Amino acid sequence: MAKEDTLEFPGVVKELLPNATFRVELENGHEIIAHTAGKMRKNRIRVLAGDRVQVEMTPYDLTKGRINYRFK
């Protein structure tokens, strides 16, 4: 799948779940399950509840996503 096929939304981390997954509430009100991107894991960027993040999602499954940026 090409990079252009992804959708990006800002959101807020609501809850930390097992296996490095998070419950994220998007700005449009939807709640999704997201995991951190590999570069964030590699660089040991911590994501905690209440953090503002950018979530990347595929148009095929709008209930799961990948956190690719944590806003400062």
Curated annotation (Swiss-Prot):
Q: Supply the alphabetized keyword list.
A: Cytoplasm, Initiation factor, Plasmid, Protein biosynthesis, RNA-binding, rRNA-binding
First and last residue of the signal peptide: none
Could you list the residue ranges that cross the membrane? none
Q: Does the record's keyword annotation contain Transport?
A: no
Q: Which GO terms describe its cellular component?
A: cytosol
Source domain of life is Bacteria
Pfam families noted in UniProt:
eIF-1a
GO molecular function of the protein, one example?
A: rRNA binding
Q: Any idea where the S1-like domain is?
A: 1-72
Q: How does it assemble?
A: Component of the 30S ribosomal translation pre-initiation complex which assembles on the 30S ribosome in the order IF-2 and IF-3, IF-1 and N-formylmethionyl-tRNA(fMet); mRNA recruitment can occur at any time during PIC assembly.
Record family assignment? Belongs to the IF-1 family.
State what protein this is by name: Translation initiation factor IF-1
Q: Which gene encodes it?
A: infA
